A protein has these predicted regions:
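Positively charged n-region of N-terminal signal peptides that target proteins for export
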Residues: 1-4
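Bacterial N-terminal signal peptides
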Residues: 7-15
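Beta-strand-rich solenoid/repeat architectures in extracellular/passenger domains
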Residues: 21-29, 42-55, 68-83, 99-107, ...
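A short, well-structured beta->alpha microelement
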Residues: 29-35
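Right-handed parallel beta-helix/beta-solenoid
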Residues: 36-41, 60-67, 79-80, 86-96, ...
């Protein structure tokens, strides 16, 4: 009997000093123990409760399925410990995390979700998910646990079937912050790691920001995903990149709120099949360097077509507001809002299969005739062809009226840097401080300028002796005064029908 009693005492003694506890519980006071979850556990932390752990993984649900966490208090790695992963959900499945309080890492990775499948995180108004260093939320290969070609990193129940193709679903109404890489969903060179099936929704009052570095959202190679920043939502970078989705495919980015960065606010270089919509404000603040506030597929390839729709404001303190140079797979830009830069509003150099429909305002406030223009159809190469099936339909205003700036620049000031096969249909106003339209290269071919309706040119059209067709459309509805210079090889097509 004494031996049995001693065994019971020792059992409870060692149980009481264990640093791991079951996750199927409610924490209503301060706890310093790690919680290790099992499948289908439900963890509740009340507003009076806290989990403050002095090592990595304050709450550990690696490889578990169906875990639900609701935090109204605090889940954190202890201040001053430099420990990571307040919540460790690697390779988990069907996880739900609802935060009404604070989730914080004293180092990196507030919530760690590498290889997780079908994980929903809701960060409500007044709540915070943060990391004192980088990555408030980190999830490499989310929704793609078998990307390496095997199922080794998938949750155990997926060991035979592999990935569900459903990644992170994030609903943010509160604050998500880190020094940099605030939400990290893939950085891998060569395509590994990468995530898919991601849905990020940042609602009115929600903020996703980096406090001292780049990338509030970094998701290289992201695929089959969408990011929506709603009216009243903010994505804010202290450095470069607001949303970095380089090498992504089949992505929807919809901004109805505010996205700001130092430069390259939306960066989707070498992307395929991007649908980008802006009805809010997107801006970059760097006054000395910027390759594009919105840069989509600046790569010489024929990837799936992109659609860019702007009814809000896209502006750049320096460099192109929209940069689509070198895209040949097909891009459509529909603008009913404002696109503005101190240098070049839209950079469309070396493009093919491009259509720009402007019903709004495209403006450069620059003053020189080399890099300051409303739209630039340029060519920075002497060996690569530029232009083919490129159409500009202008019903609004395209202007660069300061100094020697040009409304539209075509080709480059170099003998072999020409831009060909471009049609401009102008029913609106094109204005330049020097030229409304300038053929910067005398070798440009296959060019046509069609004047329609109320089409107006403020500033001469400089043809530079190119073989350009000037077409006067039957729809012209007012008297025209078009000043054309160096028109030696100009061809005029007169389709006027009673208005001449």
């Amino acid at each position: 009997m004494k031996k049995i009693l001693l065994s019971i005492i020792l059992f409870f003694l060692f149980s009481s000093i264990s640093y791991a506890g079951p996750c199927l519980t409610t924490i209503a006071s301060a706890s310093t123990n790690q919680l290790a979850c099992a499948d289908d556990d439900i963890l509740n932390v009340t507003s009076a409760g806290s989990i403050t752990y002095n090592d990595h993984k304050a709450v550990d649900l690696e490889d578990e399925t169906g875990v639900q966490i609701t935090n109204d208090g605090t889940i954190e790695t202890e201040d001053g410990t430099n420990k990571q992963k307040a919540i460790h959900a690697q390779s988990s499945l069907n996880t739900t995390i609802t935060n009404n309080g604070t989730i914080n890492s004293d180092n990196n990775e507030g919530i760690y979700i590498d290889y997780a499948e079908n994980i929903t995180i809701t960060n409500n108004a007044g709540a915070t998910i943060s990391a004192e260093a980088g990555n408030a939320i980190e999830g490499r290969n989310v929704g793609w646990c078998d990307k390496a070609g095997n199922n080794d990193n998938c949750q155990s129940s997926l060991s035979s079937s592999g990935s569900t193709a459903v990644g992170l679903i994030l609903h943010n109404h509160g604050m998500i912050s880190a020094t940099q890489g605030t939400i990290l969903l893939g950085t891998g060179g060569g395509g590994n790691p990468r995530s898919r099936g991601v849905k990020i929704y940042n609602y009115d009052g929600g903020t996703i920001k980096s406090t001292s570095g780049n990338n509030p959202i970094i998701a290289k190679y992201l695929t089959d995903s969408e990011i929506i920043n709603y009216e009243g939502g903010t994505i804010e970078s202290a450095g470069r990149y607001g949303i970095l989705a380089e090498n992504g495919s089949n992505i929807t980015i919809d901004n109805r709120g505010t996205i700001t960065s130092d430069r390259n606010t939306i960066y989707c270089r070498e992307c395929s099949g991007v649908t980008f919509t802006n009805s809010g404000t997107i801006s970059s603040t760097n006054t000395g360097t910027n390759t594009g506030t919105v840069l989509i597929d600046r790569q010489g390839d024929s990837d799936d077509a992109h659609t860019i729709t702007n009814s809000g404001t896209i502006e750049s303190a320096f460099g192109a507001a929209i940069q689509i140079a070198r895209n040949t797979g097909g891009t459509t830009i529909d603008n009913t809002g404002t696109i503005k830069s101190s240098t070049a509003a839209i950079g469309a150099g070396r493009t093919k299969n491009l259509t720009i429909n402007n019903h709004g305002t495209i403006t450069s406030t620059g003053e020189n005739d080399t890099g300051h223009f409303g739209i630039g159809f340029g060519n920075d190469s002497t060996s690569v062809e530029a232009g083919e099936n490129v159409v500009l339909n202008n019903f609004g205003t395209i202007s660069a009226i300061n100094g020697d700036a040009d409304g539209i620049k075509i080709g480059d000031y170099h003998a072999n840097k020409n831009f060909d096969d471009l049609t401009i249909n102008n029913s609106g106003t094109i204005s330049g401080g020097d030229n409304s339209i300038v053929m910067a290269n005398s070798n440009n071919t296959g060019l046509e300028i069609v004047t329609k309706g109320e089409g107006t040119y403020n500033g001469e059209i400089e043809l530079n002796s190119t073989n350009t067709t000037m077409t006067l459309d039957c729809s012209i509805s007012k008297d025209q005064k078009i000043e054309i210079h160096n028109k030696t090889n100009m061809v005029v097509t007169n389709n006027l029908c009673g208005n001449d």
